[in-house]
Amino acid sequence: MRPLSISESAKKIFPIHTKRELIDIKETDFPAVSAVILTKTDIDWIKKINELHFDLPIIVVIEEGNEEAKNNFSKFNSTVVIDSSKKNIELYSRKIESLAQKFENKIDSPFFRALKEYTLSANSEFDCPGHQGGEFFMKHPAGKSFVDFFGENLFRADLCNADVKLGDLLIHEGPAYDAEKFAAKVFNADKTYFVLNGTSTSNKIVTNAIVAPGDLILFDRNNHKSCCHGALIQGGGIPLYLQTSRNPYGSIGGIYEECFKEEYIRNLIKEKCPEKAELKRPIRLAIIELGTYDGVISNAKQIIEKIGKLCDYILFDSAWVGYEQFIPMMKVCSPLLVELGPEDPGIIVTQSVHKQQAGFSQSSQIHKKDNHINGQDRYVTHKRFNNAYMMNSSTSPFYPIFAALDVNAKIHEGKAGRCLWHNCVKLGIEARKMVIKNCKYFKPLVPPIVNEKKWEEGDTEEMANNLDYFLLKSGAKWHGFEGYGKRQYFIDPCKLNLLTVGIDIEKAEYEEFGIPAVIVANYLRENSIIPEKCDLNYILFLLTPAESFAKIENLVTQLCEFEHLLDKNVKLEKVLPDLVQKHEKYKDYRIRQLCQEIHDFYKSKNIALLQKKLFLKEYLPEYVMSPRDANIEFIRGRGELIPLSECKGRIALEGSLPYPPGIICVQPGERWNENTQEYFLCLEESINRFPGFEPEIQGVYFEKKDGKSVAYAVVLKKEFEPKK
């Protein structure tokens, strides 16, 4: 591997002797250098470099004997002052090389450092994996193409645990343990576990470690399906469902404020398990989505204060966040920054590092913060927790994913991590301002007025440090969410949620014309811009420190171009050529016609209201049997596949859900009711009316019948239904 370069501006007065590549300061990519050599006129560069918080060694070259300049520069961090005397070039060159090498040695995280060293050792391999550093692949043209595409190091780093030098990933020893210990420190956890097959598995590990059959589970109705699988189906927990909000745009909101009241929770317990209703701490585990897919993030401190005394543990599923503790204004949103005592619940946080942090796909981590209850009966020891970890983990881990988790922690260490996210937040603010300024059919989900000024008139730096600019104020009409309390929820500044026209948000009604977001999403994809997801009248873009101003400008430019095409009402083939090519139906369509037809369909079905009712207690399907029992009936073959049109009143054996977002609408063991049936029948009708815009649906099966897609679901055969 090549050593890092040196950035310099002092070439003329200090010709350093080095084998490293020298790069002009004005052309420098600072993450790729190990030292910077400057002159006394470069004081502005010192400030810029220090603002990155990389702790790069900075060497300032001054004239020999210039004590004033020496004193001026010595006050800066990581700065070394040398003179330009020719007689000292060799000495200073060695000093600079020493500083550069020392910097290189400390930038790598524990496991990644060990992995690099191991792959360079050129061992003769007679173990797994069978490709043995890529050599097997190289025996065939197809394999060589594969290796050439990914690069040799990836294959050399794909190792077997037959050699224990890197530590055992399942029992947490050696460099593997060092990496998890380091991550725990960075993320303010007592213990951290790296998970290599996604947060679906992380959630199952946590729930398998904590939940036993019959335990009460306070269950956010927004929870990902993996929480149902782990806590309710595998663990056998008894769910107490908490209703959640949706706004007319289709955005996923948080749990209603009333659901966190002790009286409300104890009444739920009386309905399901009255013998536990008066226990001091009746809830074994609460499972709460810290941030929804659509960027509504909770006040974690408030949640812990309200329900903590009722719960042994709270699991914050933070798949869609995890970076909040590195954004100072979001401190109240981080469960890992809350001060905890012996009467508080144990805190578990699961994070999908691959979503918006720096990780390969499937990289996830579990943060365990429960030392404050160590010694109490409710405490889950490492041995018990790790038993669940090993039950859900492969004995053949992919080391590069583990290394990525390790490196992610290093990136977030100290001020550097906070700096990266601060810049991301500022760019997100600028993106929203750009949309407000340039677009007429799109607007960001932000308060219209903050501190008596229009949102977009705020100072970006101030806005990036003031959560008021992202507050979902209780009772405010502009966001459309109901049931929120004071400072209970905020907009995630790192999720750019754009709303499309078509909704009168003050009245929560459909207007005469609207732009369904699915059309915009398809248009952007056809123009090489990939949004994360969309629903009825909103489209979501994830923001990370990877973003650039150029990317944002390109996005806004394409949105403006879409508006231009819409105003001209051009033929659809000019907007969505791939769609028209694949589906004859749209051959003579113009863009406004397609927008109008889908909008009218939404309006005629009032699908936003149907979606909202899916998650309200009043309209939840009847709980007939536990999800675990329903799944057992499914395994025993006691289910039957029937048309969805006949499902009303029947007991579901599978969770049914659109994907994304992976939130179950009908849980196993619940009885299909009118609202749930109508919602999925709407999806069935939309699939038939608007080919090319089909959503992915799980737990509902589609079969062709008389040229149309017909929806089916698996329900319990009537002869096996519980007797009333």
Q: What is the role of each PLM region?
A:
Residues 1-4:
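Mature N-terminal, pre-catalytic/accessory segment of carbohydrate-active enzymes
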Residues 7, 17-28, 39-51, 55, ...:
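Conserved PLP-enzyme active-site core in the AAT-like
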Residues 7-165, 173, 185, 264, ...:
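Non-catalytic terminal extensions of PLP-dependent enzymes
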Residues 33-36, 165-169, 190-191, 285-289:
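Short, basic, glycine/proline-bearing loop/turn elements
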Residues 141-234, 240:
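Long, structured ligand/cofactor-binding scaffold of large enzymes
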Residues 173-177, 396-399, 518:
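Alpha-helix N-cap/helix-start motif at coil-to-helix transitions, marked by capping-box chemistry
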Residues 192-193, 350, 528-532:
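A short linear hydrophobic-aromatic micro-motif
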Residues 193, 286-289, 539-544:
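Short glycine-rich or small-residue beta-strand-to-loop segments that form or flank ligand, phosphate
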